[in-house]
Amino acid sequence: MIDNITGEKERINPFFLPYDTPHYTVPFNRITLADYEEAMMEGIRREDEQIEKIINNPDEPTFENTIIPEDEVKGRKHYYDLLSRVESVFFNMLSAETNDEMDALAQKMSPILTKHGNDVSLNPKIFERVKYVYEHHGELTPEENCLLEKSYEGFVRSGALLDEAGKDRLRKLTEEASMLSLQFSQNVLKENKAYTLHITDEQQLDGLPNTAREAAHEAAKEHGLKGWVFTLDAPSYGPFMMYSTQRELRKELYMARNTLCIKDNDTNNLELCKRLINLRREMAQLLGYDTFADYVMKHRMATKVENVYKLLNDLIEAYKPKAIEEREEVETLAKEEEGAAFKMEPWDLAYYSQLLKKKKYDLDPEMLRPYLELGNVIKGVFGLATRLYGITFKENKEIPVYHPDVKPYEVYDKDGSYLAVLYVDFHPRKGKRDGAWMTEFQGQWIERDGTNVRPHASLVMNFSKPTEDKPALLRLGEVETFLHEFGHSLHGIFANTRFESLSGTNVWWDFVELPSQFMENFAVENEFLRTFAFHYQTGEPMPDELIEKVIASRNYGAATACLRQVSFGLLDMAYYTHKEEFTEDIISFEKKAWAPAIIDEQRMDTCMTVQFSHIMAGGYAAGYYSYKWAEVLDADAFSVFKKEGIFNQATAQRFRDNILSRGGTEHPMTLYKRFRGQEPTIDALKERDGLTKGQ
């Protein structure tokens, strides 16, 4: 369009136009802050129009004229589905590339978007049509049945059967919970990014490997400082806690990390957590459930709270004796080093655990870094997918990205056909939250004309950064994280379902971690390491002796690590099995809730809950146990590959066909048994963790 006064071409919001980028990828380079609000408001208006069309259809409600259109309104991220498309970009940027203006816009738009979602899910006229189809439908395919069930249950679980007073109350609860979840995340991010440990005396770097020193020197320059800067981001925090000989500095860093959001300031999350727990409890009880956990279990493989506790208690029984042995061994070494009177504190654990590992296996994780250069690791991980599934990856610099660090790849199937776009974003920066995750800018679905719309997946991580004279050299744990998130992306890349809301990672939460945790198993497999672990300077392969040490030490600390995850699961369930109003002190409650899985003396001046985004602001409320549930599945599944060959393409094809490509189109156990031939047992997990010997 041409402006009549200036004669200049009028700018059009890029969200309003069909993307003219490769594969209809997001034109990040054209999007401004103002575009988001305008597009979201227009998207709401358009969705309202679509809902009215469904409601006012004079024909008898059917699967074709009600369920499919209703699913399309709520789910698609393609160029004609404006609201879902702009939301997927905005909220992904809120985690990966945010700023104060983005945060403020999120605070403004969150209640508006929540209200719109409630307007749809609590609309009695559209529910009436969905309910009619649910009660009168004819023969449907299994996938259609799944969508119908999901649609009907979605309305019911959103309050469609409540009276008007109940609906109004539910609206208020969900709107407040949405705002508080956002505030929780923003508080954690602000406090995390605000802290730095600035060192100017080089003697205080004693014990730290060169990679940590160089990264800290780069961080200091980024902050406009001389010397070295350490932060609470994992690539900085982890090595400092493992290697620094400066006990007081370890304590300072530990306390900074573990006292986030409990100080007397405007980012304190203590009362906010109580309110979120109570909001979710009240929502669940309004919908007829005793607790929020009962509400969640309706759509979980676990099915009942009792089954979750059985898993967690079985793991405590199996792993706690070994974890106590592991801790006693670390404490014995610490006393040998420091004297019999030495009392080990939490900020000592990583340091002495690392010393013990080095003593037992003659292995220091820093010995591995030169062989784990990021470029080689990328080739190794992508090459693993090529070897298993025949797919290939091609970087396409014509695809726009949201930050120069991000690399976009096209993914092609073994027959050469286009499969997906995959973005990878590896390093920490200001405005990017801590941790690692997989997300999507576009899902997968099949159009009515048969067109298979392919996904745009993104892997976001916080790995060790390159320095002035070294490329990014990773820890083995970072390689495992890469494999984990890559496993999630394969769940999306291989998706091949008719409906987007059943596609890829749109599965029950205690099944969604199977593909990701399954991939982690390859990290310590000799055959896999030999494909990419080459010295970044000499090109020499990782020595056999070093690989043997990695494999020999694979179970080091496994019981302690298991109990840590179980403790988080216990904490999560304790909050969300609460039947009465939660009024207890968060810190005291936390220590009591996870006590059965704790083997150390507890501190009352630290708190996990206030920064536990998974269960307070993420999708894992009453669901953190899912990691251990899926670990049982992944160990059982990988045992098949160990038996048939870890690169066995026939086994991999069976995994792809029955699990990775099917999304949520059938019950997860049905899909798993079709791949495995039987239900999983805990035996493979215990064997993998060294608690039992293989048969």
Residue ranges and their predicted role:
Residues 20-35, 88-109, 130-172, 229-271, ...:
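Short His/Asp/Glu-rich catalytic/ion-coordination signatures at enzyme active sites or charged loops
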